[in-house]
UniProtKB/Swiss-Prot annotation:
This is Penicillin-insensitive murein endopeptidase. Pfam families: Peptidase_M74 (PF03411). HAMAP family: MepA. Residues 1-19 form the signal peptide.
Length: 274
Protein backbone atom coordinates (compact mmCIF):
# COMPACT_ATOMS: atom_id res chain seq x y z
CA UNK A 1 0.00 0.00 0.00
CA UNK A 2 2.69 2.44 0.98
CA UNK A 3 5.79 1.67 -1.07
CA UNK A 4 5.21 4.41 -3.64
CA UNK A 5 4.41 6.96 -0.95
CA UNK A 6 7.83 6.70 0.69
CA UNK A 7 9.64 8.81 -1.89
CA UNK A 8 6.88 11.40 -1.82
CA UNK A 9 7.11 11.75 1.94
CA UNK A 10 10.87 12.08 1.71
CA UNK A 11 10.45 14.88 -0.82
CA UNK A 12 7.99 16.67 1.42
CA UNK A 13 10.30 16.34 4.39
CA UNK A 14 13.25 17.73 2.44
CA UNK A 15 11.18 20.55 0.95
CA UNK A 16 10.22 21.69 4.42
CA UNK A 17 13.77 21.37 5.69
CA UNK A 18 15.46 24.08 3.62
CA UNK A 19 14.80 26.97 6.00
CA UNK A 20 16.72 27.02 9.27
CA UNK A 21 14.64 27.03 12.43
CA UNK A 22 15.19 29.36 15.40
CA UNK A 23 15.82 26.36 17.64
CA UNK A 24 19.19 25.90 15.97
CA UNK A 25 20.31 29.23 17.41
CA UNK A 26 20.10 27.87 20.95
CA UNK A 27 23.51 26.36 21.59
CA UNK A 28 23.11 25.19 25.20
CA UNK A 29 20.29 23.57 27.20
CA UNK A 30 17.83 25.89 28.92
CA UNK A 31 18.41 25.86 32.67
CA UNK A 32 15.81 24.44 35.01
CA UNK A 33 14.35 21.12 36.07
CA UNK A 34 13.89 18.74 33.16
CA UNK A 35 10.55 19.31 31.41
CA UNK A 36 9.47 17.83 28.09
CA UNK A 37 6.85 20.19 26.66
CA UNK A 38 4.28 19.61 23.95
CA UNK A 39 4.05 16.82 21.40
CA UNK A 40 6.86 14.76 19.93
CA UNK A 41 6.44 16.60 16.61
CA UNK A 42 5.70 20.03 18.07
CA UNK A 43 7.44 20.78 21.32
CA UNK A 44 10.61 21.65 23.18
CA UNK A 45 12.52 20.80 26.36
CA UNK A 46 13.85 22.65 29.38
CA UNK A 47 16.72 21.16 31.37
CA UNK A 48 17.99 18.81 28.67
CA UNK A 49 21.16 16.81 29.29
CA UNK A 50 23.94 16.04 26.85
CA UNK A 51 24.60 12.35 26.35
CA UNK A 52 28.19 11.71 27.49
CA UNK A 53 30.23 11.26 24.32
CA UNK A 54 32.67 8.81 25.90
CA UNK A 55 31.29 5.46 27.03
CA UNK A 56 32.16 1.78 26.95
CA UNK A 57 28.94 0.44 25.47
CA UNK A 58 28.03 3.03 22.84
CA UNK A 59 29.45 5.58 20.42
CA UNK A 60 27.78 8.77 19.25
CA UNK A 61 27.68 9.55 15.53
CA UNK A 62 27.79 12.97 13.83
CA UNK A 63 28.71 14.85 17.00
CA UNK A 64 29.49 17.90 14.85
CA UNK A 65 25.72 18.35 14.41
CA UNK A 66 25.16 18.60 18.18
CA UNK A 67 22.03 16.48 18.22
CA UNK A 68 22.95 14.50 21.33
CA UNK A 69 20.69 16.24 23.87
CA UNK A 70 17.61 14.84 25.56
CA UNK A 71 15.59 14.45 28.72
CA UNK A 72 17.57 12.73 31.51
CA UNK A 73 15.22 9.74 31.09
CA UNK A 74 16.45 9.35 27.50
CA UNK A 75 20.10 9.59 28.52
CA UNK A 76 19.51 6.92 31.18
CA UNK A 77 17.69 4.68 28.70
CA UNK A 78 20.61 4.81 26.26
CA UNK A 79 23.00 3.97 29.07
CA UNK A 80 20.82 1.06 30.26
CA UNK A 81 20.44 -0.39 26.78
CA UNK A 82 24.11 -0.08 25.88
CA UNK A 83 25.14 -1.66 29.19
CA UNK A 84 22.87 -4.63 28.49
CA UNK A 85 24.27 -5.01 24.99
CA UNK A 86 27.84 -4.70 26.25
CA UNK A 87 27.33 -7.22 29.06
CA UNK A 88 25.95 -9.73 26.56
CA UNK A 89 28.99 -9.26 24.30
CA UNK A 90 26.81 -8.19 21.38
CA UNK A 91 28.92 -5.24 20.22
CA UNK A 92 28.82 -1.45 20.38
CA UNK A 93 25.56 0.50 20.16
CA UNK A 94 25.71 3.31 17.58
CA UNK A 95 23.72 6.36 18.65
CA UNK A 96 22.33 8.72 16.01
CA UNK A 97 20.17 11.79 16.45
CA UNK A 98 18.52 12.60 19.76
CA UNK A 99 17.52 16.27 19.92
CA UNK A 100 18.91 19.79 19.98
CA UNK A 101 19.83 21.59 23.23
CA UNK A 102 16.32 23.01 23.69
CA UNK A 103 14.56 20.51 21.46
CA UNK A 104 12.29 22.05 18.87
CA UNK A 105 11.95 21.61 15.14
CA UNK A 106 14.92 20.53 13.02
CA UNK A 107 15.61 22.09 9.64
CA UNK A 108 15.78 18.64 8.08
CA UNK A 109 15.63 14.92 8.63
CA UNK A 110 13.04 14.71 11.39
CA UNK A 111 9.49 15.75 12.11
CA UNK A 112 9.68 14.55 15.72
CA UNK A 113 12.71 14.44 18.08
CA UNK A 114 11.46 17.75 19.54
CA UNK A 115 10.83 17.00 23.23
CA UNK A 116 14.00 15.13 24.18
CA UNK A 117 12.35 11.70 24.18
CA UNK A 118 13.39 10.27 20.79
CA UNK A 119 16.62 8.63 19.66
CA UNK A 120 17.78 6.94 16.47
CA UNK A 121 19.96 3.85 16.90
CA UNK A 122 21.72 2.09 14.03
CA UNK A 123 20.74 -1.53 13.43
CA UNK A 124 24.30 -2.79 13.45
CA UNK A 125 26.53 -3.73 16.36
CA UNK A 126 30.20 -3.50 15.40
CA UNK A 127 32.57 -5.61 17.45
CA UNK A 128 35.36 -3.12 16.77
CA UNK A 129 34.78 0.47 17.84
CA UNK A 130 34.47 2.95 15.01
CA UNK A 131 37.11 5.57 14.33
CA UNK A 132 36.41 9.30 14.64
CA UNK A 133 36.11 9.63 10.87
CA UNK A 134 33.65 6.74 10.69
CA UNK A 135 31.52 8.34 13.39
CA UNK A 136 31.47 11.72 11.65
CA UNK A 137 30.45 10.17 8.32
CA UNK A 138 28.71 6.93 9.28
CA UNK A 139 27.84 4.36 6.65
CA UNK A 140 24.32 3.11 7.24
CA UNK A 141 23.64 -0.57 6.58
CA UNK A 142 20.46 -0.88 4.51
CA UNK A 143 18.84 -4.06 5.80
CA UNK A 144 15.84 -4.00 3.45
CA UNK A 145 15.85 -5.83 0.11
CA UNK A 146 15.16 -3.97 -3.12
CA UNK A 147 11.59 -5.30 -3.25
CA UNK A 148 10.85 -3.50 0.02
CA UNK A 149 9.19 -6.61 1.42
CA UNK A 150 12.03 -8.54 3.03
CA UNK A 151 15.30 -8.01 4.84
CA UNK A 152 18.58 -8.92 3.17
CA UNK A 153 19.39 -12.36 4.65
CA UNK A 154 23.16 -11.86 4.50
CA UNK A 155 22.89 -8.63 6.52
CA UNK A 156 20.32 -9.71 9.08
CA UNK A 157 21.44 -11.32 12.34
CA UNK A 158 19.86 -12.57 15.58
CA UNK A 159 21.73 -9.79 17.38
CA UNK A 160 19.64 -7.17 15.56
CA UNK A 161 16.43 -8.85 16.71
CA UNK A 162 17.81 -9.00 20.23
CA UNK A 163 18.83 -5.33 20.19
CA UNK A 164 15.31 -4.25 19.21
CA UNK A 165 13.76 -6.64 21.74
CA UNK A 166 15.93 -5.30 24.57
CA UNK A 167 14.87 -1.76 23.72
CA UNK A 168 11.19 -2.70 23.47
CA UNK A 169 11.25 -4.47 26.83
CA UNK A 170 12.39 -1.29 28.60
CA UNK A 171 9.46 0.03 30.63
CA UNK A 172 10.10 3.64 29.57
CA UNK A 173 9.80 2.85 25.85
CA UNK A 174 6.39 3.27 24.21
CA UNK A 175 7.20 2.87 20.52
CA UNK A 176 10.00 1.73 18.24
CA UNK A 177 9.69 2.64 14.55
CA UNK A 178 11.27 0.34 11.96
CA UNK A 179 10.75 -0.40 8.29
CA UNK A 180 7.80 -2.75 7.61
CA UNK A 181 10.16 -5.39 6.21
CA UNK A 182 12.15 -5.30 9.45
CA UNK A 183 8.98 -5.59 11.53
CA UNK A 184 7.99 -8.59 9.42
CA UNK A 185 11.34 -10.28 10.10
CA UNK A 186 10.97 -9.63 13.82
CA UNK A 187 7.56 -11.31 13.68
CA UNK A 188 9.18 -14.35 12.08
CA UNK A 189 12.04 -14.44 14.59
CA UNK A 190 10.05 -13.87 17.78
CA UNK A 191 8.76 -17.35 18.56
CA UNK A 192 6.28 -17.56 21.44
CA UNK A 193 7.63 -14.51 23.31
CA UNK A 194 5.73 -11.82 21.42
CA UNK A 195 4.46 -9.23 23.88
CA UNK A 196 7.29 -6.81 23.11
CA UNK A 197 6.37 -6.75 19.41
CA UNK A 198 3.38 -4.53 20.19
CA UNK A 199 5.72 -1.58 20.68
CA UNK A 200 7.51 -2.12 17.35
CA UNK A 201 5.66 -0.10 14.74
CA UNK A 202 6.15 -0.22 10.94
CA UNK A 203 6.92 3.13 9.38
CA UNK A 204 8.33 4.72 6.23
CA UNK A 205 12.11 4.58 5.65
CA UNK A 206 13.88 3.33 8.83
CA UNK A 207 15.77 0.78 6.74
CA UNK A 208 19.02 0.99 8.72
CA UNK A 209 18.02 2.28 12.14
CA UNK A 210 15.33 2.09 14.77
CA UNK A 211 13.67 5.18 16.17
CA UNK A 212 12.98 4.71 19.88
CA UNK A 213 10.43 6.87 21.68
CA UNK A 214 9.95 7.14 25.44
CA UNK A 215 6.81 7.92 27.41
CA UNK A 216 6.25 11.39 28.83
CA UNK A 217 8.27 11.64 32.04
CA UNK A 218 6.64 12.00 35.43
CA UNK A 219 6.62 15.67 36.27
CA UNK A 220 6.51 16.88 32.67
CA UNK A 221 2.94 18.13 33.00
CA UNK A 222 2.85 19.82 29.58
CA UNK A 223 4.12 16.76 27.71
CA UNK A 224 1.63 15.15 25.31
CA UNK A 225 1.83 11.36 25.15
CA UNK A 226 0.54 9.25 22.29
CA UNK A 227 -2.21 6.71 22.69
CA UNK A 228 -0.82 3.19 23.28
CA UNK A 229 -0.27 0.99 20.21
CA UNK A 230 -3.19 -1.28 19.29
CA UNK A 231 -3.43 -4.56 21.24
CA UNK A 232 -1.62 -7.59 19.86
CA UNK A 233 1.76 -8.15 18.25
CA UNK A 234 1.02 -6.11 15.11
CA UNK A 235 2.07 -8.96 12.84
CA UNK A 236 -1.26 -9.51 11.06
CA UNK A 237 -3.37 -7.55 8.60
CA UNK A 238 -2.06 -4.16 9.68
CA UNK A 239 1.51 -5.12 8.84
CA UNK A 240 0.54 -6.78 5.56
CA UNK A 241 -1.25 -3.61 4.46
CA UNK A 242 2.14 -1.94 4.14
CA UNK A 243 3.04 -4.31 1.32
CA UNK A 244 -0.11 -3.79 -0.74
CA UNK A 245 -0.06 -1.63 -3.89
CA UNK A 246 -1.61 1.82 -3.58
CA UNK A 247 -5.33 1.98 -4.15
CA UNK A 248 -6.51 3.47 -7.47
CA UNK A 249 -7.10 7.18 -7.18
CA UNK A 250 -4.91 7.61 -4.11
CA UNK A 251 -3.24 11.01 -3.97
CA UNK A 252 0.16 12.01 -2.61
CA UNK A 253 0.22 13.52 0.88
CA UNK A 254 -0.15 17.27 1.11
CA UNK A 255 2.52 19.18 3.00
CA UNK A 256 0.97 20.61 6.14
CA UNK A 257 1.76 23.94 7.73
CA UNK A 258 3.38 23.36 11.14
CA UNK A 259 0.91 23.98 13.99
CA UNK A 260 1.48 26.81 16.48
CA UNK A 261 4.01 26.07 19.18
CA UNK A 262 2.85 25.28 22.69
CA UNK A 263 2.76 28.59 24.62
CA UNK A 264 5.64 27.54 26.90
CA UNK A 265 7.84 26.76 23.89
CA UNK A 266 6.96 30.05 22.22
CA UNK A 267 7.80 31.89 25.43
CA UNK A 268 11.13 30.08 25.53
CA UNK A 269 11.93 31.19 21.98
CA UNK A 270 10.84 34.75 22.74
CA UNK A 271 13.22 34.89 25.70
CA UNK A 272 16.24 33.16 24.22
CA UNK A 273 16.12 33.82 20.46
CA UNK A 274 13.56 36.31 19.16
Amino acid sequence: MKNTVIALLALLASAGSLAATPWQKISQPIGGSAQSIGAFSNGCIVGAEALPLSATGYQVMRTDQRRYFGHPDLVQFIQRLSNQVHNKGMGTVLIGDMGMPAGGRFNGGHASHQTGLDVDIFLQLPQTRWTSSQLLKPQALDLVASDGKHVVPSLWSPQISQLIKLAAEDSEVTRIFVNPAIKQQLCLDAGSDRQWLRKVRPWFQHRAHMHVRLRCPAGSLECEDQAPPPPGDGCGAELQSWFEPPKPGSTPPVKKTPPPLPPSCQALLDEHVL
